[in-house]
């Protein structure tokens, strides 16, 4: 597997290149450890992710977030990410949002 995982004590995230378009980063697996939630660590983790994205010379990044995940959307918005599109996911039985940022 080509997945690259980054971990801090407060949580972790993964970054992969979009197949056939290696200047786009696909960000996924972002989570804050449950024991330390609601303390601002999402923002700490996101700042670390943004540094990694820039150091890897990506031009654009995308991620998905379930519409009901208000905390994650707050982190994305504060980091300069933009809502792009929403769709209904049959697997999750709820709406999922696609977010992106130009780096």
List the model feature ranges, each with a label.
Residues 1-20:
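Non-catalytic substrate-recognition and accessory regions of acyl/acetyltransferase enzymes
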Residues 13-16, 27, 46-49, 63, ...:
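Polar/charged side chains located within well-ordered beta-strands of beta-rich proteins
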Residues 17-28, 37, 92-95:
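A conserved beta-turn-beta hairpin within the catalytic core of GNAT-like acetyltransferases
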Residues 29-37, 65-66:
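A short, internal acetyl-CoA/4′-phosphopantetheine-binding micro-motif in the GNAT/acyltransferase core
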Residues 36, 40-48:
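Conserved acetyl-CoA pyrophosphate-binding loop and the N-cap/start of the following alpha-helix
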Residues 43, 67-85:
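Conserved active-site alpha-helix within GNAT-family acetyltransferase domains
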Residues 53-65:
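Conserved GNAT acetyl-CoA-binding A-motif
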Residues 64-65, 80-98:
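Conserved catalytic-core motifs of GNAT/GCN5-like acyltransferases
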